[in-house]
Amino acid sequence: MATATTQRPLKGPAKRMSTWTMTREAITIGFDAGDGFLGRLRGSDITRFRCAGRRFVSISHPDYVDHVLHEARLKYVKSDEYGPIRATAGLNLLTDEGDSWARHRGALNSTFARRHLRGLVGLMIDPIADVTAARVPGAQFDMHQSMVETTLRVVANALFSQDFGPLVQSMHDLATRGLRRAEKLERLGLWGLMPRTVYDTLIWCIYSGVHLPPPLREMQEITLTLDRAINSVIDRRLAEPTNSADLLNVLLSADGGIWPRQRVRDEALTFMLAGHETTANAMSWFWYLMALNPQARDHMLTELDDVLGMRRPTADDLGKLAWTTACLQESQRYFSSVWIIAREAVDDDIIDGHRIRRGTTVVIPIHHIHHDPRWWPDPDRFDPGRFLRCPTDRPRCAYLPFGGGRRICIGQSFALMEMVLMAAIMSQHFTFDLAPGYHVELEATLTLRPKHGVHVIGRRR
């Protein structure tokens, strides 16, 4: 297996952090990228620390990340951070490993290719247009809440060819509560504060329906409620088959229709939850940053007027909206929904002269990489032009909004298409400014979201 080349000069000695400090902050503060646990990982390309008896290495140089995600990918698997997700969504492309993951990923790769997704544009546009048409000009509202509703409707339409209607809000509330409970479970499991066997048993109990004490009962209720909702949709489709091009039909027919019912359920639930959560956050940050940068917004509005006017966009229009796409890419750099990923070393390795022992958890703080001035000059400035200039000397792992390597998010093309359509359709009718007195606060759970929403006023164009 490959190791990182040793002829390159070391990026610097490994930084070492206090075990007590890191353990305390993992428990009490959490994973906050500013003042909390991960904020301490700034300023070094590689940081070593222990937390509750487990070994960790944080890598912030794109060459190191490239090594883990590409060159030596067979030496690393997804870490325990995905255990709580497995409790709710089961075994799926996000939580699976090895040959099983490769087989299922291979069966779905072509489905998420751009040429296939073009057929879903109509299913995406209708719910976006409906939510936009219902907007009251001049009224103050929470854009994050609106994006949650919109993305859930888009994913439900593209996945199931139906609108969940009044269920949208309750499903989002369940997903939000679930993420927060999962983050608390992750602190206990990822940081080794309970034996892994106990941790795995708790996950099994949550999923199986065994009676649990109050701290875990809510997580269990969330899991079982979502399970019933998804299974009812699958039951209806099996009882009344359709010729729809939606993703549920793709899952039911994958590999000739031999996937177990439970696997179809797990994948469908994952696409719905992960697909709406990350995209809703990304769009919330997009509107927030556009409100703070009116020149970039005006440039986008001019592009939309020139390309679309007031007609609905089509799949052919997406490639013509270069500035709109660049604004979305820059907002994902500035506030990446997936702001950290982790891998566990299953074999000894060497990263640029630094030894990585088997069993070490390797943390990749995407948020820090996206704000490193070596790859992003003046990183705190919102500059969509970065993605039109495309410098050739920028390392490929300096930009990771969808992760990287062979496990890069399978839904990235779906998400980008959805985001461009939302930006275009909503901006044809409205401009959005921040509400007076609003101040953003970041909340870093398993995703990076605005803690108290993004409060804006929509003005008719």
Swiss-Prot record:
Pfam families per UniProt: p450
Cofactor(s) needed by this chain: heme
Record family assignment: Belongs to the cytochrome P450 family.
Enzyme class, spelled out: oxidoreductase
Residue numbers binding heme: 409
Key word Heme present: yes
UniProt keyword Metal-binding present: yes
SUPFAM superfamilies listed in its UniProt record: Cytochrome P450
InterPro entries recorded: Cyt_P450, Cyt_P450_CS, Cyt_P450_E_grp-I, Cyt_P450_sf, Cytochrome_P450_Monoox
Molecular function via GO: heme binding; iron ion binding; monooxygenase activity; oxidoreductase activity, acting on paired donors, with incorporation or reduction of molecular oxygen
Superkingdom of the organism of origin: Bacteria
Gene: cyp132
Protein name: Putative cytochrome P450 132
UniProt-listed Enzyme Commission number(s): 1.14.-.-
Alphabetical keyword list: Heme, Iron, Metal-binding, Monooxygenase, Oxidoreductase
